Swiss-Prot record:
It comes from the Bacteria. This is Uncharacterized protein YqcB. It comes from Bacillus subtilis (strain 168).
Amino acid sequence: MITQLYRERTAADLKNRISKVLLNGNETEIVELTIQGAVVTVLTQREEDIKHIKSVQILDDQNNVITERTTDLDVSNNRTLDFRITFEVV
């Protein structure tokens, strides 16, 4: 059985490895990277002038992809976007 302590340790390792977020292949600043128990949350800065979203990637300290989502989403005019990505180690 996986213990809560092990889940929290794994979440801490994940948090320490997250180094950047790419939006459509361009780096966007991480403004907050938090951990609560076995839950890691990444929050990016607000981005302006984004008209279309094709992909969001989270990379580790060696530029390996931790997770990636692809989409085909148009963004309305005069919108700013930030992204909150949450991982829960179960």
